[in-house]
Amino acid sequence: MIDSLDLVIDTIVAREVLDSRGNPTVEAEVLLEGGAMGRAIVPSGASTGAHEAHELRDGGDRYMGKGVGQAVNHIEERIATALCGLSALDQAAVDAAMLELDGSDNKSNLGANAILAVSMATARAAANGLGIPLYRYLGGPMANLLPVPLMNVINGGAHAANSLDFQEFMLVPHGAPSFREALRMGTEVFHTLKKLLSDKGMSTAVGDEGGFAPDLGNVEAGEILVEAISKAGYKPGEQISLALDVASTEFFENGRYAFDGGSYTSAEMVGQLEQLVEKFPIVSIEDGLAEDDWDGWKLLTERLGGKVQLVGDDLFVTNTKRLQQGIDSATANSILIKVNQIGSLTETLQAIDLAGRSGYTSVISHRSGETEDTTIADLSVATRAGQIKTGSLSRSERVAKYNQLLRIEDELGSQAVYAGAVGQGPRGKA
């Protein structure tokens, strides 16, 4: 029998650790009265939306200005004082207390990185205190849907030092019968792609998210991916499709999109994306237009919304207010979920809930600056999101999430359902 007093927050500690790019980030540990402990590390993005919650950095010379000592101090000196004595089971109350303590619209006083670290660590402490997995604690008895992975195997844009304008070219193994098989399929294509690139004399060095970063044009990248899928023994569009993260805000300036040597209006950009969808088995396009180009997004949705998943990342920044604006204007049909864009677990769950009630899909996502923390793997199963973006099939901070999903699938046994096998997630074109 678990005593409720055992689940009361007793101590909170924090430290500065490193992410996958060698930059400092925040780790928090929440210890409960009964001895259970939860630990979490927050990620950090390279291409960040202008409307994201504020990530607190120290400035100055230390770590080239990227230290997080202030955020760590806020946790140990202010957040700990406010939260000790609260029940870890009341996630909403814990997060609300931190938001009230911060008092800003974008978490700029305490830092979203400080608040999120404690928020995630609290949930893990509660799960550990109850002796149940995190996905079960967050999702209850219906948490059994394994997500379709969107595997970023060719990196460009802000994630790689190459000529590729679009940020991510992803494999989507929706035709697999299980997550384990989806992972195998993606891995086999990844290694086939590596050999293809090597045979063509191209670089097989990897970018921030573990994908290859060759000097290619956007069309060439699509062509070599389709070739790799076929050479690995799979059917493009039927078993494995493609997804893009255009990250178009990165090359949007003065009302025009500059990429592949051209300069395009919003309408012309939509036309470029339409051509790619006609040419390749693309089932999902993320940030096809810039974060504040609402008119362009509306046109994109009218033209392609019935054919492919249109994901708002910089557009929505995991924020219910911006998502509601999209819903009200019939803009996009999917939201990318990044816990550090909004900065607390409760607000993340609220965004996923609003999306689901409004007919929008949710894609749980990592950041380019990641760590060994696997919270998002559990979150994807807990929320039955049906899709996850967590990078390529290399670099241990990416693979850690895939391995956690394998463990969850094994633990669920016959109760496990792969989203692709039941028609959830982005659909292929046979």
Curated annotation (Swiss-Prot):
UniProt cofactor note: Binds a second Mg(2+) ion via substrate during catalysis.
Record-annotated active site: E209 (proton donor), K338 (proton acceptor)
GO biological process annotation, one example: glycolytic process
Binding annotation for Mg(2+): D245, E286, D313
Cofactors, names only: Mg(2+)
Molecular function GO terms recorded: magnesium ion binding; phosphopyruvate hydratase activity
Keyword check for Chloroplast: no
Pathway the protein takes part in: Carbohydrate degradation; glycolysis; pyruvate from D-glyceraldehyde 3-phosphate: step 4/5
Gene3D superfamilies named among the record's database cross-references: Enolase-like C-terminal domain, Enolase-like, N-terminal domain
Transcription as UniProt keyword: no
Record-linked Pfam families: Enolase_C, Enolase_N
Keywords for this protein: Cytoplasm, Glycolysis, Lyase, Magnesium, Metal-binding, Secreted
Class of this enzyme: lyase
EC assignment: 4.2.1.11
GO cellular component: cell surface; extracellular region; phosphopyruvate hydratase complex
Catalysis: reaction(s): (2R)-2-phosphoglycerate = phosphoenolpyruvate + H2O
Source superkingdom: Bacteria
Binding-site residues for (2R)-2-phosphoglycerate, renumbered to this chain: Q167, K338, R367, S368, K389
Its biological purpose: Catalyzes the reversible conversion of 2-phosphoglycerate (2-PG) into phosphoenolpyruvate (PEP). It is essential for the degradation of carbohydrates via glycolysis.
Stored HAMAP family: Enolase
Protein name (Swiss-Prot/TrEMBL): Enolase
Gene name of the record: eno
